[in-house]
Amino acid sequence: MFWDKVAFAYDFFETVYNGKVYNRTGRQVADFIDESDVVLECACGTGAISQYIAPVCKKLIATDFSISMLKKARKKCRKHGNVTFRRADITHIRCRDERFDKAVAGNVIHLLPDPELALNELKRVVKPGGKIIIPTYINKESATASMAARLLEHLGAHFERQFNLETYKQFFADMGYKDVEITVVNGRMPCAIAIIEKKKREAIHKNSDQ
């Protein structure tokens, strides 16, 4: 699996090459988390954002499809006793409906062939009134960011889509999401953080596995 092979290099990218963006992104994501929250994080990677969520929530379930990524994430969060790590697929989340107060999925939407399936799953597992938090690279119009993306593609990554700020906003509109709040963290590879609140009247269309 590609992400297992490049976990070390990706960790370097997160903490060194694009460290300032990741640090600010982690802090901004944490600002949306309450101390009573039970949080699901999908595609946690090497724990760059997990380490900011863990200190401010009641419980964090951090998941990724890559075992090597999870190993690095565990090391980053080893001092926090409220974190559980699991291997999981964001497009098929094995838990009951409306379990979590918040769901976070960082820098994964642009990699998925069917992002709508992932968004539906995130909405399914979040409680009414809860929030879905989706930080995503917006590297389409930045020369430095595009170069980094090309390097990752050269190593074997596959980007299904690349965003700028306007196309990121349009992406959610096309998926039927209105009133999406978006903030941008600028840097070498900028990141846009989308916040979607699950309305209390929204129905759940998919049954859980448990």
Regions found by a protein language model. Name each.
Residues 1-34, 48, 72, 76, ...:
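Conserved class I S-adenosyl-L-methionine
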Residues 13-16, 133-193:
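C-terminal alpha-helical "lid/dimerization" subdomain adjacent to the S-adenosyl-L-methionine
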Residues 37, 130:
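Glycine-centered, small-residue-biased loops immediately flanking beta-strands
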Residues 40-92:
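Class I SAM-dependent methyltransferase SAM/SAH-binding core
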Residues 91-103:
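A short acidic, Gly/Pro-enriched loop at the edge of an enzyme's catalytic core
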Residues 102-114:
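A short SAM/SAH-binding and catalytic strip from SAM-dependent methyltransferases
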